[in-house]
C-alpha cells in the first residue's frame, strides 16, 4: 500500500473509470461504483486497493485479500473471490502501472523539493544560460556558460550542469547529478549521484609511464531515458557515447566511452559495459553483467545476471555464464559439472 505521508493520490477512480482507462473487461458490473484510491500487493491490500495477478502461482493469495479490484488474465478469473471486482486483461501489470501513474503522478515525475516551481535566487547561474518557460532551478544548483534548458525541466538543488550542455523539455535532474559535454533529450530522468560526460578511461602506456588520451566526444541521451542513482556514463573519445530512446538504466552502472546502447533497453544494477561496445534495441542485461570492449550485442538479446560477455551475440539470443554462451550450452555444461561431481563423490 502506498504511504500517504510520502505519496498522496491525486484523485479517486471508480472501478468503471479504471476499466475505461485501460480497456480491461469488467466481469462484475455491480462493482462499477466502487472507489479505488491506492495500489497494493495482494498481502497488504486494504479497502480501496487495486491489485494485479499475472501468474497462476500467485493466485492463491487472492483468497482473503481486502482489495476492491484485481487486474488478471482469463486463466485466473476462477480464483478471484466474489468480494472483488474482476478486470480481465492480457497485460495485468502494465495496466496496473498505468493506473498507478494516474493516481500517483508525483511518484514517476518528482516535484520540486521546496514546493515552488521557480528559478531560485540562490542557484549559481551563468548569465549566458538560456531557459524556456516553467523551468525550475533550485537553491544550490550550478548552471554553466551557454547551457540551454527546455520547458518544464526541474534542476534540483546541488545539481551541476556544465558549459554548453543542452537539456530538453520535462526532464528531472536530481540532487548531486553532474552533467558535462552532453546533449540530453526530452523527458529524461537522472537520479541522485548520476555523472554524465566525464572523461573516459583512455590511456596509453609505455616505458616512460602512462599517458592520457584526450576524450573529445560527447554523451547523447535520447528522449525518455531514465538513469538510476550513482550511475556513470563517460563521454566518447572521438565518437559519441549514446543512450537510445526509452532505455532504462538501473543504479550503479558504469558505461564507458563510445558505447552505443539502442532503444528501449533494460540494464540492471552493477553492470559494467566497456568501451566501444554496442547493444541493440530492446536488449536486456541482468544485474552485475560485465561486457568486454568492442563487443557487438544484437537486438532483443537477454543476458543472465553476473554473466561475463567476451564475444559478439547475434540478435534474439539468450546467453549466460562467464564467459557467456548460449543458454542451452550453458545449462548443459552446468548439468555435466554437477553429474561429474556426483560421480566423484560416489567413487570416494
Curated annotation (Swiss-Prot):
GO terms for molecular function: N-acyltransferase activity. Keywords: Acyltransferase, Lipid A biosynthesis, Lipid biosynthesis, Lipid metabolism, Repeat, Transferase. Its EC number is 2.3.1.191. It catalyses: a UDP-3-O-[(3R)-3-hydroxyacyl]-alpha-D-glucosamine + a (3R)-hydroxyacyl-[ACP] = a UDP-2-N,3-O-bis[(3R)-3-hydroxyacyl]-alpha-D-glucosamine + holo-[ACP] + H(+). Disulfide bonds: none annotated. The active site is at residue 257. GO terms for cellular component: membrane. It holds the Pfam family Hexapep. It comes from the Bacteria. Pathway: Bacterial outer membrane biogenesis; LPS lipid A biosynthesis. CDD domains: LbH_LpxD (cd03352). One of its GO terms (biological process) is lipid A biosynthetic process. PANTHER family: UDP-3-O-ACYLGLUCOSAMINE N-ACYLTRANSFERASE, UDP-3-O-ACYLGLUCOSAMINE N-ACYLTRANSFERASE 1, MITOCHONDRIAL-RELATED. Catalyzes the N-acylation of UDP-3-O-acylglucosamine using 3-hydroxyacyl-ACP as the acyl donor. Is involved in the biosynthesis of lipid A, a phosphorylated glycolipid that anchors the lipopolysaccharide to the outer membrane of the cell. Homotrimer. Belongs to the transferase hexapeptide repeat family. LpxD subfamily. This is UDP-3-O-acylglucosamine N-acyltransferase.
Amino acid at each position: 500500500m502506498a504511504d500517504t505521508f510520502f505519496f498522496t493520490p491525486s484523485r479517486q477512480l471508480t472501478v468503471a473509470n479504471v476499466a475505461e482507462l485501460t480497456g480491461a473487461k469488467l466481469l462484475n458490473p455491480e462493482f462499477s461504483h466502487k472507489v479505488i484510491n491506492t495500489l497494493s500487493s495482494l498481502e497488504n491490500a486494504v479497502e480501496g486497493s487495486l491489485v494485479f495477478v499475472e501468474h497462476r502461482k500467485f493466485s492463491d493469495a487472492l483468497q482473503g485479500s481486502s482489495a476492491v479490484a484485481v487486474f488478471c488474465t482469463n486463466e485466473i478469473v476462477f480464483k478471484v473471490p466474489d468480494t472483488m471486482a474482476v478486470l480481465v486483461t492480457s497485460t495485468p501489470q502494465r495496466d496496473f502501472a498505468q493506473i498507478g501513474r494516474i493516481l500517483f503522478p508525483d511518484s514517476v515525475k518528482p516535484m520540486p523539493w521546496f514546493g515552488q516551481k521557480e528559478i531560485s535566487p540562490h542557484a549559481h547561474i551563468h548569465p549566458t544560460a538560456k531557459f524556456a518557460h516553467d523551468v525550475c532551478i533550485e537553491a544550490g544548483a550550478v548552471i554553466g556558460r551557454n547551457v540551454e534548458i527546455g520547458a518544464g525541466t526541474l534542476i534540483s538543488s546541488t545539481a551541476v550542469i556544465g558549459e554548453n550542455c543542452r537539456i530538453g523539455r520535462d526532464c528531472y535532474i536530481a540532487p548531486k547529478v553532474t552533467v558535462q559535454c552532453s546533449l540530453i533529450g526530452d523527458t529524461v530522468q537522472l537520479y541522485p549521484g548520476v555523472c554524465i560526460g566525464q572523461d573516459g578511461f583512455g590511456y596509453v602506456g609505455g616505458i616512460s609511464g602512462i599517458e592520457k588520451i584526450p576524450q573529445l566526444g560527447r554523451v547523447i541521451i535520447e528522449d525518455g531515458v531514465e538513469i538510476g542513482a550513482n550511475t556513470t556514463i563517460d563521454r566518447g573519445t572521438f565518437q559519441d557515447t549514446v543512450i537510445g530512446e526509452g532505455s532504462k538504466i538501473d543504479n550503479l552502472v558504469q558505461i564507458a566511452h563510445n558505447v552505443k546502447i539502442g532503444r528501449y533497453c533494460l540494464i540492471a544494477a552493477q553492470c559494467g559495459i566497456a568501451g566501444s561496445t554496442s547493444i541493440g534495441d530492446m536488449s536486456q542485461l541482468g544485474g552485475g553483467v560485465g561486457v568486454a570492449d568492442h563487443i557487438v550485442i544484437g537486438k532483443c538479446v537477454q543476458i543472465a545476471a553476473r554473466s561475463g560477455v567476451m564475444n559478439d551475440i547475434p540478435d534474439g539470443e539468450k546467453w549466460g555464464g562467464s564467459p557467456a554462451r548460449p543458454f542451452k550450452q550453458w545449462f548443459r555444461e552446468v548439468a555435466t559439472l554437477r553429474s561429474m561431481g556426483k560421480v566423484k563423490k560416489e567413487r570416494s
